[in-house]
C-alpha cells in the first residue's frame, strides 16, 4: 500500500467514524484478535441490519470523535487505544453479544502461543502405533501398548495457564488432535446514551436481580431484628413475633382471642 493509499484509507475511516458516531447512540468496544474472516462474516450475518462494525486507524477515529464536539463522547476518546474496534447497533446489546459469543473458533496450539487455561491430556488409547512410544517416554508420559495402540496410562498436564507453547507441546497436542485454544470477538465496554458500562453487566438477567434483591432484603431484615430496630424489611417478622407473644399470653391466661381460634383451626 502506497502512502497515498494509506492516507485515503485513513480519511475514509474518519468519514465513516464521524457518520456512525452521529447516527448511533449505542455502540460497543470490541477486540478481534485472532478472529478470522469467516467468523466475522457469520457474526455480521446474525446481526443482520441491526449493527455495523468499524475498524481502522485509532488516530482517525479519535479525530472524528474530537471534531464532533459532543461532550458525552469525551469518555470514549480515551478508550480508543490498542486493537479496539466499534460495533454500532440499534437494538439490544444482549442480542449483539449473543451473536459474538456463539461464534467461537477452536484452534491448535502453535509455538509461541500463551496458554489460555491449563491443558491436560487425559488417559486414553491414542490410536498411535507402538513406534511412537519413545516420543511419549521422552516427554515423561507413562504409556503402555493396548491392542497394538499406544495408551496413555494417567492424565498428563501439558500446559499451565500463562505458559508459552513450546515445540514439543505443540507437536504433542497436534498429534492427539487437541485444540486447546478458543478465539472469538470479545466485547469490553458498552456506550448507551452517554453512559459507559462494562459488558459483563448485560449478562445479568431479571432473575439475578430479583435474587439479589431478595437476599438484600433478608439481610436487612435479619440485621434489624438483631438490633431491635423496626424497618420496612423487618416489619412482617415483627408483626409475626408480636402475634406469637400475644398468643402465648392469651394461652397462659386461659383467655381466648379470635386469632387464637383461627390458628387452632388451621
UniProtKB/Swiss-Prot annotation:
A Gene Ontology cellular-component term: cytosolic large ribosomal subunit
Record-annotated membrane-spanning stretches: none
Keyword Cytoplasm: yes
One example of a Gene Ontology biological process annotation: ribosomal large subunit assembly
GO molecular function annotation: large ribosomal subunit rRNA binding; structural constituent of ribosome
Entry's localization field: Cytoplasm
Alphabetically ordered keywords of this record: Cytoplasm, Ribonucleoprotein, Ribosomal protein
Gene3D superfamilies: 3.30.70.1730, 3.90.105.20
Entry function: Ribosomal protein P0 is the functional equivalent of E.coli protein L10.
The protein's assembly and partners: Component of the large ribosomal subunit.
Family of this protein: Belongs to the universal ribosomal protein uL10 family.
Name under which the protein is recorded: Large ribosomal subunit protein uL10
Amino acid at each position: 500500500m502506497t502512502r497515498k493509499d494509506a492516507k485515503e484509507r485513513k480519511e475514509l475511516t474518519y468519514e465513516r467514524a464521524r457518520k456512525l458516531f452521529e447516527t448511533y447512540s449505542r455502540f460497543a468496544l470490541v477486540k478481534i484478535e485472532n478472529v478470522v474472516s469467516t467468523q466475522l462474516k457469520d457474526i455480521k450475518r446474525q446481526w443482520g441490519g441491526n449493527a455495523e462494525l468499524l475498524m481502522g486507524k485509532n488516530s482517525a477515529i479519535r479525530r472524528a470523535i474530537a471534531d464532533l464536539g459532543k461532550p458525552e463522547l469525551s469518555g470514549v476518546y480515551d478508550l480508543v487505544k490498542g486493537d479496539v474496534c466499534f460495533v454500532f447497533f440499534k437494538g439490544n446489546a444482549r442480542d449483539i453479544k449473543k451473536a459474538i459469543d456463539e461464534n467461537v473458533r477452536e484452534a491448535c496450539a502453535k509455538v509461541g502461543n500463551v496458554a489460555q487455561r491449563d491443558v491436560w491430556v487425559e488417559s486414553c488409547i491414542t490410536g498411535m502405533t507402538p513406534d511412537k512410544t519413545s516420543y511419549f517416554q521422552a516427554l515423561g508420559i507413562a504409556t503402555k501398548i493396548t491392542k497394538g495402540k499406544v495408551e496413555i496410562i494417567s492424565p498428563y498436564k501439558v500446559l499451565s495457564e500463562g505458559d508459552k507453547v513450546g515445540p514439543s507441546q505443540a507437536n504433542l497436542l497436534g498429534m492427539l488432535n487437541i485444540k486447546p485454544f478458543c478465539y472469538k470477538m470479545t466485547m469490553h465496554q458498552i456506550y448507551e446514551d452517554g453512559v459507559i458500562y462494562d459488558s459483563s453487566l448485560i449478562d445479568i438477567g431479571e432473575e439475578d436481580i430479583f435474587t439479589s434483591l431478595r437476599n438484600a432484603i433478608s439481610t436487612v431484615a435479619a440485621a434489624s431484628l438483631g438490633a431491635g430496630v423496626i424497618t420496612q424489611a423487618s416489619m412482617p417478622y415483627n408483626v409475626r413475633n408480636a402475634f406469637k407473644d400475644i398468643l402465648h399470653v392469651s394461652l397462659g391466661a386461659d383467655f381466648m382471642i379470635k386469632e387464637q381460634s383461627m390458628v387452632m383451626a388451621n
